[in-house]
Each structure stands twice: as structure tokens, then as C-alpha cells.
């Protein structure tokens, strides 16, 4: 019985997740349902192989309905300590905290 090469599996899974989300970005203006399916598959692969999806890629689709954000389909509001992205498809609000820049002071 062969042993699983987990590093290789996770590398392939990470590449596949990046590819699927990139394809979703390309297809979101053409076939919205297909773009949503690509995001769904990317999330399933990431969960199956326990691969993290980077924050920059997570911010490109709705967490609830998995539709990629498209012009006119989401609203962005900036508050003091956070950015609020509202999906106009399902109404889900994603709140992204903004951390103030730290000033390094030498005493």
C-alpha cells in the first residue's frame, strides 16, 4: 500500500483553487452561474485538502451565496474601523477590519 504524499496533494490542491477562482473571475460577466460553480468547487477542494484560500481571493466572492462580486452586484462602505461589503444578491454583509498602522517609537 502506497503512502500519501500530503505536501504534493496540498500543492496541487492550492494550484487548483487558484485556477478555479481565476476562472470564476473571467466568467463572472459571461455566465454568472458557471462562475459561482467554480467558486463552489474551489471551496470544496480547499476544505477537503485543508488548504487556506488567501484573504485577497476570499474577498472576491460572497461567503453566503458564493457569487463572485461583479459591478452593480455589491456595495462597499468604509467605516472607521472596517470595510463593509454587502452582496446585493443575497444581502450578506462581510465586515473586514482595518487595523491602524503601528508607529514604532524608540524611547
Curated annotation (Swiss-Prot):
InterPro entries: RNP4, Rpr2/Snm1/Rpp21
Entry EC no(s): 3.1.26.5
Record's subcellular location: Cytoplasm
Record's keyword terms, sorted: Cytoplasm, Endonuclease, Hydrolase, Metal-binding, Nuclease, tRNA processing, Zinc
Residues engaged in binding Zn(2+): 62, 65, 87, 90
GO MF term list: ribonuclease P activity; zinc ion binding
Enzymatic reactions: Endonucleolytic cleavage of RNA, removing 5'-extranucleotides from tRNA precursor
Keyword Hydrolase set for record: yes
GO terms for cellular component: cytoplasm; ribonuclease P complex
Family named by the database record: Belongs to the eukaryotic/archaeal RNase P protein component 4 family.
Stated role: Part of ribonuclease P, a protein complex that generates mature tRNA molecules by cleaving their 5'-ends.
Assembly: Consists of a catalytic RNA component and at least 4-5 protein subunits.
Protein name, UniProt field: Ribonuclease P protein component 4
Organism: Archaeoglobus fulgidus (strain ATCC 49558 / DSM 4304 / JCM 9628 / NBRC 100126 / VC-16)
Taxon lineage: Archaea, Methanobacteriati, Methanobacteriota, Archaeoglobi, Archaeoglobales
Amino acid at each position: 500500500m502506497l503512502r500519501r504524499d500530503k505536501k504534493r496533494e496540498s500543492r496541487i490542491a492550492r494550484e487548483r483553487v487558484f485556477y478555479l477562482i481565476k476562472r470564476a473571475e473571467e466568467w463572472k460577466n459571461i455566465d454568472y452561474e458557471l462562475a459561482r460553480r467554480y467558486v463552489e468547487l474551489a471551496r470544496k477542494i480547499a476544505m477537503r485538502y485543508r488548504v487556506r484560500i488567501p484573504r485577497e481571493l476570499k474577498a472576491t466572492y460572497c461567503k453566503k451565496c458564493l457569487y463572485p462580486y461583479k459591478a452593480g452586484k455589491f456595495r462597499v462602505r468604509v467605516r472607521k474601523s472596517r470595510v463593509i461589503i454587502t452582496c446585493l444578491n443575497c444581502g450578506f454583509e462581510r465586515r473586514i477590519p482595518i487595523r491602524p498602522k503601528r508607529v514604532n517609537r524608540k524611547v
